[in-house]
Structure formats: structure tokens, C-alpha cells
Amino acid sequence: MPAPATYATGLTPLPTPVPKVSKNIMERFSLKGKVASITGSSSGIGFAVAEAFAQAGADVAIWYNSKPSDEKAEYLSKTYGVRSKAYKCAVTNAKQVETTIQTIEKDFGKIDIFIANAGIPWTAGPMIDVPNNEEWDKVVDLDLNGAYYCAKYAGQIFKKQGYGSFIFTASMSGHIVNIPQMQACYNAAKCAVLHLSRSLAVEWAGFARCNTVSPGYMATEISDFIPRDTKEKWWQLIPMGREGDPSELAGAYIYLASDASTYTTGADILVDGGYCCP
């Protein structure tokens, strides 16, 4: 008679073993000795996470597309005594993503943590008023397809290694419909990312974890174009009455990336000032 196994993933024997990690909780939050790869990390949320990871001891691979980030990688190395290097890649190009991930693995020897953070907002207004489908294709290609390419090729490395933590930057927009701005495309893409993560958490259960962080409105350059009267409406809708600072997201990412979360997979952490509560 065959030994019992998990229904979805075929893991056996049961129960599966508990990971051997430090009993000291502060040591479990440390990223010392780990390698983190972060897309869209030349500025905003991505760089805030990259800096937090460096502070926690991780070596960091910074990804950029249009803004060269060698100086930022050098800053992380000199300031925090870690290894950091910048890589140019268009995450909408599957071959570039595959090559970049393989290069990072070669340069650093492994990849412990991957953050799929690159993304763009929808700014075209109500969907049916847009004269063509180019804007839709652009947002979905970056926010969903680009995240998928990263997961596919990072996941292959995680499977080969037998370990890894993958984190998607999703959004509260995957949970609710934003107002007053109309952004059906962005909402749909981020909702898809949430379910992609949960699906991969099951597929990868034997070798890696997969989770999401869902930021609310953050004070970054991605929202610089938003008129003040729109932001005032946001503040009224946010129970805490303000946008978040990117640094306020760092703790969620560090938890999911670290050994403090070895039994956390398929989860989403909302960091939205309470927006989704009412």
C-alpha cells in the first residue's frame, strides 16, 4: 500500500519535516547570507525594499529598465557592507528575463529571494472610452505577464536549489475597485497576480514559498501625476488619512523573505492604512 501523500502536491512521507532554522526570532528575521533579486528596484517601492534587505544583511540584485542604477547598487554596497549589482532588463521580454535571472545566479551563486515588483499604473480613464487596446496591452504585459516570466524562471532555479521565497508586489486594487479614478485594467491585472501567487504556492510547495504584498496608496513617483484634489479624496477614504511611505512596506517583505515565515505560503499582506477594511 503506497504511503499517504499530500493531495495537491504529492509530498511524502507525511508529516513533512519542519525546516531547521534558528530558535531565536530576531535571527530568523535576518537575511544575512541570502541573495535577493528585485525587479523595478531603481526607485520607489522597489528601492525601499532593496535597501531594507541590504540593512538586513542580504546581497541584492537591482533590476532596472530605463533608469541606470549602478550608483544605487554601489550605495547599498558601501553603506551596508553587502554585495549589490544592477541589471538592465525589460521584464516584458521573456528571453531577457530568463537570461538576466541566469546571470544573477551565476554572479551571486544562488538566488534565495525574488521580488516581482516592476509595474505601471493605468492612466487612460474609463476602459470603454480608450480608442484602442494599446494601453490595455501595455499594462497587462508589464503588470501580469512580466510577473509571470519572473516567476517561471526564478521558480526553475528554486526547484533546482530546493528552496526559495518568491514575493509578488500585488495591490489593494486586486481586492477592491478604486475610486474616483477608473482603472479596470490595473485592478484586473493585480487580481490575477494575487491568484497566480496562490496557485504557485501550491505548485511549488515541495521546494519554495510564494506570497504577495498588496500596497495601498504610496507616496512614490508613480503617483506624482495625480492631482491634489484626487489625493484629497484618497485621504478621506483611507482610515489612517494619508498615503503610506515606501519604507512602511519593508517589514512585510522582510517577513515573507526571511526564515520567520517558513510556514507562510499563498498569503497576501495588505499594507494600505486600512483602506480595504470599511
UniProtKB/Swiss-Prot annotation:
EC number in record: 1.1.1.138
Keyword Mitochondrion: no
pH dependence text: Optimum pH is 10 for the oxidation reaction, and 4-9 for the reduction reaction.
Active site per database record: S171, Y186, K190
CDD domains: MDH-like_SDR_c
A Pfam family reported for this protein in Swiss-Prot or TrEMBL: adh_short_C2
Annotated InterPro entries: NAD(P)-bd_dom_sf (IPR036291), SDR_fam (IPR002347)
GO molecular function: mannitol 2-dehydrogenase (NADP+) activity; NADP binding; oxidoreductase activity, acting on NAD(P)H, oxygen as acceptor
BP-aspect Gene Ontology terms: mannitol metabolic process; protein homotetramerization
Keywords on record: NADP, Oxidoreductase
Reaction(s) catalysed (UniProt annotation): D-mannitol + NADP(+) = D-fructose + NADPH + H(+)
Residues noted as binding NADP(+) in the record, renumbered to the chain: I45, N117, K152, Y186, K190, T220
Gene3D superfamilies, A to Z: NAD(P)-binding Rossmann-like Domain
Thermal dependence summary for this entry: Optimum temperature is 25-28 degrees Celsius.
SUPFAM superfamilies: NAD(P)-binding Rossmann-fold domains (SSF51735)
Uppermost EC category: oxidoreductase
Keyword Disulfide bond: no
Family: Belongs to the short-chain dehydrogenases/reductases (SDR) family.
Assembly mode: Homotetramer.
Function: Versatile oxidoreductase that catalyzes the oxidation and reduction of polar as well as non-polar substrates at a very broad pH range. Preferentially oxidizes secondary alcohols. Has highest activity for racemic 2-heptanol and racemic octanol. Is also an efficient reductase for selected substrates. Has highest activities for ribulose and fructose. The enzyme is (R)-selective in the reduction direction and produces exclusively the (R)-enantiomer.
Name assigned to this protein: Probable NADP-dependent mannitol dehydrogenase
